């Protein structure tokens, strides 16, 4: 992909003139309302009319917005494109220096969502501003992206840079005071972002910090800074060890674009291609950057680090800190220090990645933001309207790599029931359009969810909006700080906190809703409780489904007893002193559900049972005959009718599981050994047969 600086909309110097209104960069359907319309909205907000109008508008936006498995363009750009862009960029500001300036990468294109938030990228100490190039297309779908470029020969001091950015941020905030401003700070840019947030606590900022250089004072380079000042100022910086602090380590940068699953020959070819593209650039960059420039950059970094560390306690912004494991500048433990010092901070570690995290071929920044539940368009995150559907690249990564082995071990069999009662393989019996409510049994450790989410996306292109426990959304359980934990996968693939209001809103938007009435009592059941339902006597979802004409599909799944064996359940764990205190402490901090429900149905204690794996069997699903709730007005008014339908659905789920337990005995490929032989004969992509329904 050839690039040139002419392909980027370079805006005037940031301190010179204000930028255009964000709405002028978007389609007319997403422009800000006129003053009269805004006044009407304020009036309507106080009445039911405004609520109905906003709902209709939200539904309309959903219809023309992003669809599940949309192409986000991630992976199209490579490190070589970064080198090409760097070569085409006038690093010295066109020969005359010049103040810092903002530019809009054309690769981002027009945003595909309604009223996207603004995203500002602050570069590292090199100041080029192109380090985000491999993320441009994916971020450009949901953000309005602008990047800061600081010419090599620019001598704006640290507080001068802050003033430039502050003017821009305040201008944008005045244009859209109810929308957040995202700031991505890479290395030195992380210091700028934190300093900016400390000076403007009243502005709604969301900071994405990538290996912030807040620990530069502890690095060896600071110790040799006095020696560098003694070197002649006009001497070109040609030493790779010094250049790597500006544009990175050549060998590491050549390696970041190599895919993990490529052959040795392709790996060598890709590495050679990247390195050959970079070496001429190093020579060019080395002749542009003089020793006095390097010394200035390092002093600028030192002043920024000192300024930032002295004001960490004043930062009020929401923060996502991304730390790679073998980074150059932040030493081990810096991410933990910042996590403790900052008020609202989430951390994600990428222990096998280099310090050039943004240019890793497998690193998708938008996926990380979505998984951490950090994407929002208003002052508060709305899990319904702010949800971004999974992309095709996320689908391939999650189910083609992360859960590939699990899918192979489970070898799920999906069956559904047509309206005439015939059972077929696949999801043909499930409607193609919502609103649909899937109600069923929660297997041990929720092992059935990933396969269901994959199959509905693959066959129906439908996102399952799982009504999940609040533990996935409330609280900051950062003990699971890793690249992609299950806590991130749940919101990434449509999970929302279980509540009547969220269920109501999902039905209103014609979504596919997944409900487990048994909750974690079923998913964390005790010994000898396999396939036992723990449904409370609360048929409210039936009445709500009737109100919206929802199609209810009872389903069951079996196979957990072929996969895992419970060694210690909750009744045994609570008798072990240390473990008992840990469970009690965790549940005290965690918001509970069903506190008013008596009996075992309300015993929703979060814990982790000790289990042992078995020689894998197989997972079986059966989606029952659809129950059309449209026209069932009597269910809404008559509680007795609602209770009876609720019991009928529960009975159908139990019958489905009894059917599957009986029929799986007839499956010749229930054992993983038989399935392995079959795939060895017919190929790993061949669908493995099962019993005749």
Name what the model sees in each region.
Residues 328-334:
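Conserved alpha/beta-hydrolase "acid-adjacent" motif
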Residues 314-316, 321-323:
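Short beta-strand/loop motif that positions the catalytic acidic residue
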Residues 62-155:
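Conserved HGGG/HGGXW glycine-rich cap/lid loop of the alpha/beta-hydrolase fold
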